[in-house]
Amino acid sequence: YNLFDLDNGLITFVPDHAGHSFTDPSYMLPAFLDKWARTASANRSFWEKAATASRQHLIASAHPVTGLYPDYSRFDGRAYAWRHAAYDTSIYMFDAIRCPINVGMDYYLCGKDCHRQKAVMYRLLTFFKNDGFKHGHFTLDGSKAFGQYTCGMAGANAVGAITLAQSNIPEYRELAREYVQRLRDVKPPTGKFRYY
């Protein structure tokens, strides 16, 4: 099995029998793939395809209203509940927290899908603000909320806010400012679960 699906250009969850037929939206790193497409000694056309597919997947896998991402997804972006996992991987839980970082980084470094990236980050950041920055896990439509909003989420969402920081829309700029300020104000985590 290959690490990337050669037909669609997306990275697989794991290149083995159980994990090659789906992916994880947080694995989508179009900015890195774009760099490889420009600098690789071989297979540049594949890396270009992979960058485009990865960028598209960060839009397709986000919920159309909340902007929330599933932890795992099918190649078409639909949420995927992997039967081998110890929890429901079709919801916003652990891996999904990283998706705003990937969107913000790609927006800043590449600027190839700015309009859609702004739209998806506005939905996501508005959703968390409307939740009062209380919860950390959700069904994708936001109907079931549990767990706590974490320092890691504050950091990831602040990176996603880069997409709104220079917007012509004052409301977008203010939302970005609020997320950056929230990150600045967060106390450094300590203890066993400080990574999250």
Where are these regions (language model features)?
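Charged low-complexity "KEKE/polyampholyte" interaction tracts
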Residues: 172-187
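Hydrophobic, glycine-enriched assembly/anchoring segments
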Residues: 187-196
